[in-house]
């Protein structure tokens, strides 16, 4: 079976005041369609950096210094940002580790949920609203219509994490990366 995602010999380096720091060195794995892969390791071992590399969301002081990241055989490293924007959310989505900082505090939950739906699902505001409310229900948020009009600071940490999960699955991506998705959940 062909891999949906293939990461081969990935190397990521950060430029620091003290010089070059290699955060990921030689990571390789593949994920087939319909499969689940868990990457475990101690804090600081490069799990999140690997995930951010796949999405090409590394900071300006970081660079992929070697290796390959392929989605359905297509190399992602070096793709123009415009093309990566089409891939993010639509083909690959991520549940980020920290819902406290991942949501924009100046935008309502509804605005933040509707944006990727309108962008990737080619629908208008009314349909995006309906889909966003539905996905909030699916992740266990009570009174989703009310929550759509609220700002992140008005929600508990667990509810914010559920919003992050809803945002990640809202466009039904082919690959979902979950970086400690249950960290803040009230379960």
Where does each model-flagged region fall?
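ABC transporter nucleotide-binding domains
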Residues: 1-186
